[in-house]
Amino acid sequence: MSKKIKYVVLFVEGETEKEFYESLIRFYRLKSKNAITQSKVFNVKGISRFEKTVTSKLKIEVLPKFHNSEIEVVCCYDTDVFELAQKPPINWKIVRKKVNDLGINSFHEIKAVKMIEDWFLKDIVGLSQYLKIDVPKKLEGKSGYEKIKTLFKKGKKPKVYQKGSNTHKFIPDLNIQLIRDAVKDELAPLEKALSVKL
């Protein structure tokens, strides 16, 4: 019996994350010593929509096309909404079970500690170059999101940072290698699923 072809499906919180993960996968394709696994990124459009969207996308868009493939599911999200919430917006055990019920046994979570903006700040030089400002000595704001919003206000072009809006314009200016190296432990399950060898 021939070995099944692998297919990795990423589910992300929003447009900002979709832009970033698509850039990260392009980086892996360029830098990996071997061919990486075929993949697709879906935007679930909000943390609370993972449970419903993951199963419906798998049923309608993935399984009919890749029913003979070994499918791996990767859910990528920010941890900030789980840290202080008395009732978290999503129960990952339920999501995992629903994925398993579809006959998919490989399920991974990629957690951006606090939020993905904290990852972007790992390349403060690239962000500053995009905004045409000097690299700040100190960042203002409590969260990564607030810090990036403050940076954008100082910038020469778009003066407003809004999750999902204009992200495609600054993501190419980011040093993906630098960010990947800084958060490689968090990205390890994704790299394994994609068969990345750097």
Q: PLM features: what roles do these ranges have?
A:
Residues M1-K6, K18-K45, T55-L198:
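C-terminal accessory helical subdomains adjacent to catalytic cores in phosphodiester-
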